[in-house]
Amino acid sequence: MSNKPIADMIETIEHFAQTQPSYPVYNVLGQEHTYGDLKSDSDSLAAVIDQLGLPEKSPVVVFGGQEYEMLATFVALTKSGHAYIPIDSHSALERVSAILEVAEPSLIIAISAFPLEQVSTPMINLAQVQEAFAQGNNYEITHPVKGDDNYYIIFTSGTTGQPKGVQISHDNLLSFTNWMITDKEFATPSRPQMLAQPPYSFDLSVMYWAPTLALGGTLFTLPSVITQDFKQLFAAIFSLPIAIWTSTPSFADMAMLSEYFNSEKMPGITHFYFDGEELTVKTAQKLRERFPNARIINAYGPTEATVALSAVAVTDEMLATLKRLPIGYTKADSPTFIIDEEGNKLPNGEQGEIIVSGPAVSKGYMNNPEKTAEAFFEFEDLPAYHTGDVGTMTDEGLLLYGGRMDFQIKFNGYRIELEDVSQNLNKSRFIESAVAVPRYNKDHKVQNLLAYVILKDSVREQFERDIDITKAIKEDLTDIMMSYMIPSKFLYRDSLPLTPNGKIDIKGLINEVNKR
């Protein structure tokens, strides 16, 4: 039986609270909370929020990790007509402070201890939230988030300058959710059993909670005490009865460091959903070997177009024949085009910037008209967004990714795509993972290319010195890379830094190399 689109997120959650009140919606390391719990707790908290007399539709910050109280608070805020701004409890203080400055929230709900002192914004803590749950207040839903009202606001993790708050409306959310639960590429089962690992402050989280709540499924998550310790994390993850794994490819790469991450130990896994960064052929091949019968979905899209705008199930033929995986068939309701520098549409097969239009495109950045005007525009009478990504559309309607426009550099007259260099580095038999980073001179021209490298196990035992390893890697690469693309310096590391969202922190490495 195929899934049906939903008309309203809160009405759908209410429906499941009536039809399956004792079915688990949230499981934190074996501790279950049901759809009935979610309804009564969110109703009771919504009643308390209404009594605070906050300005109508004003945004509210919710600070915490993956606790059940986070989800119940989000639902309560939606019922009471407020957009929520999730901030992860591991966020840097400067980031938390910058978000408060931009967002000017009417309230902070701190599920985890709030790290900033002397905040003028009113605050509710975890004990008060739990006390509100215990009151068991009834609640009549008369002024929920609807239509073009903001449902959530997610701040992108810019490494420089002020973070930008992407406003996602209820209509935006429905466009994404209904595509995901009805799309043949995702093939999302009813009552999905989903891993809820990416933090709520990262819009990849919407890829697990939206379809799960829309289809009456269960979210499985882990307390932050465990997620901070990789050994504990993977010992716990392997015991979860999940069917769908949603994460960045980097997180799956980390999981594959464990020999237990395979279909024998985790026989329940039927789907992998990837988004947030590029899924390489190498990672997908390794995953296919570990989980030969699982469906691997490569999805793509910016936060500004509500999580994702395209998706494709990776086939064995793709893995055998392609150097770079396609990023998917685009959503039917979201016309996606390739344009040139003058803004003209390009024919299939030609490379340009990917722009997306339609009902999933955000209304813009919160309280930031300047940045909104730079990135958002109207295209053929539809709201549209400049992704800043390079791409090509095939005649079959598949979108191909060509890297970030801001990760394209000019070196010795050649235009070089940093992600191309990184992908080729990863083909070396000596390399487990690598990224290419430019070093600039004082005139901001690229002086040379560096590579940060994690070596495969036992490589060091084969060579006496790092210089010998570098020589062997360069010999490995001469057949597959132009000489001007091969980095001149190789820096060997045990690990590469990740952003709070689980992506390799390329911008951070660029800043490190250039001592910014």
Swiss-Prot record:
Q: Which GO terms describe its molecular function?
A: ATP binding; D-alanine [D-alanyl carrier protein] ligase activity
One record GO biological process: lipoteichoic acid biosynthetic process
What keyword terms does UniProt attach to this protein? ATP-binding, Cytoplasm, Ligase, Nucleotide-binding
EC top class, as a word: ligase
Q: Which InterPro entries match?
A: AA_adenyl_dom, AMP-bd_C, AMP-bd_C_sf, AMP-binding_CS, AMP-dep_synth/lig_dom, ANL_N_sf, DltA, DltA-like
Location comes to:
Cytoplasm
According to the UniProt record, one GO cellular component term is: cytoplasm
Binding residues for ATP = 156-157, 298-303, 389, 401-404, 503
Cytoplasm found in the keyword field: yes
What reaction(s) does this enzyme catalyze? holo-[D-alanyl-carrier protein] + D-alanine + ATP = D-alanyl-[D-alanyl-carrier protein] + AMP + diphosphate
The pathway entry for this protein reads as: Cell wall biogenesis; lipoteichoic acid biosynthesis
- Where is it chiefly localized? cytoplasm
This protein's superkingdom?
A: Bacteria
Family annotation (HAMAP family): DltA
**Which family is it part of?**
Belongs to the ATP-dependent AMP-binding enzyme family. DltA subfamily.
What does this gene product do?
Catalyzes the first step in the D-alanylation of lipoteichoic acid (LTA), the activation of D-alanine and its transfer onto the D-alanyl carrier protein (Dcp) DltC. In an ATP-dependent two-step reaction, forms a high energy D-alanyl-AMP intermediate, followed by transfer of the D-alanyl residue as a thiol ester to the phosphopantheinyl prosthetic group of the Dcp. D-alanylation of LTA plays an important role in modulating the properties of the cell wall in Gram-positive bacteria, influencing the net charge of the cell wall.
Name the UniProt record assigns to this protein = D-alanine--D-alanyl carrier protein ligase
Organism listed in the record: Streptococcus pneumoniae (strain 70585)
